[in-house]
Amino acid sequence: MRTIVVCSGGLDSVSLAHKIAAEQQLIGLVSFDYGQRHRKELDFAARCAARLAVPHHIIDISAIGGHLSGSALTDDIEVPDGHYAEETMKATVVPNRNAIMLAIAFGLAAAQKADAVAVAVHGGDHFIYPDCRPGFIDAFQRMQNEALDGYASVRLLAPYVEVSKAAIVTDGEKHATPFAETWSCYKGGRLHCGRCGTCVERREAFHLAGIPDPTEYEDQDFWKAAVSQYSAAEVR
């Protein structure tokens, strides 16, 4: 299938891009600038597109993102430290973010005669982000079937929606994903902080997958204390 991947530049979406390139016909990556403080991730998405020799579309929706206030990812609100399973991580929710981005991606896919849009939502996101859950994926597909009826037929591929981030690391290694060429940290510093929810989840995923983590973190050991109170089953 001719497929466009929504790629933030993070571990999940870059791994997905490599998977789609190996298993489908990857025709491009689409990324979004929504005013996120960690927009350096877009550079890693661009590197992925160059590596896979496909076009890279960066859609500027920062004007919209500026109105979706109240998130630590876009506003002057401190990004909380700790495990993704903690209630404080809801501060990183950007309301309706995936619905907005996917609607644009589907429009792009229809215009380019693509067969599918692929997105890297995964099981570890379910606790915090409602627009990463299977119910949302299914409902969005039904909505797009109506929105594009008679014009285009575009599938929403979400191969990781029921699996853990550790499983994505395993799949990424299978498809030769260069993990060092991905960015996860929400704080957007020179290095991954090692303390925010996505850094902790990233470090834990490599540990659970039994695959060496090439990432350099400012705090190499914080993740151990952060995950010690949760079992893998409780957060996935």
Curated annotation (Swiss-Prot):
Listed NCBIfam families: 7-cyano-7-deazaguanine synthase QueC
GO BP terms in the entry: queuosine biosynthetic process
InterPro entries: QueC, Rossmann-like_a/b/a_fold
Enzyme class per UniProt: ligase
EC assignment: 6.3.4.20
GO molecular function, one term: ligase activity, forming carbon-nitrogen bonds
Catalytic function, reaction form: 7-carboxy-7-deazaguanine + NH4(+) + ATP = 7-cyano-7-deazaguanine + ADP + phosphate + H2O + H(+)
Presence of keyword Protein biosynthesis: no
PANTHER family (alphabetical): 7-CYANO-7-DEAZAGUANINE SYNTHASE
Cofactor entry: Zn(2+)
Keywords: ATP-binding, Ligase, Metal-binding, Nucleotide-binding, Queuosine biosynthesis, Zinc
UniProt remark on cofactor binding: Binds 1 zinc ion per subunit.
Protein name: 7-cyano-7-deazaguanine synthase
A Pfam family this chain is assigned to: QueC
Binding site for ATP: C7, S8, G9, G10, L11, D12, S13, V14, S15, L16, A17
Keyword Ligase among UniProt keywords: yes
Pathways involved: Purine metabolism; 7-cyano-7-deazaguanine biosynthesis
Lineage: Bacteria, Pseudomonadati, Pseudomonadota, Alphaproteobacteria, Hyphomicrobiales
Binding residues annotated for Zn(2+), in chain numbering: C185, C193, C196, C199
Annotated function: Catalyzes the ATP-dependent conversion of 7-carboxy-7-deazaguanine (CDG) to 7-cyano-7-deazaguanine (preQ(0)).
Similarity section: Belongs to the QueC family.
Gene3D superfamilies: HUPs (3.40.50.620)
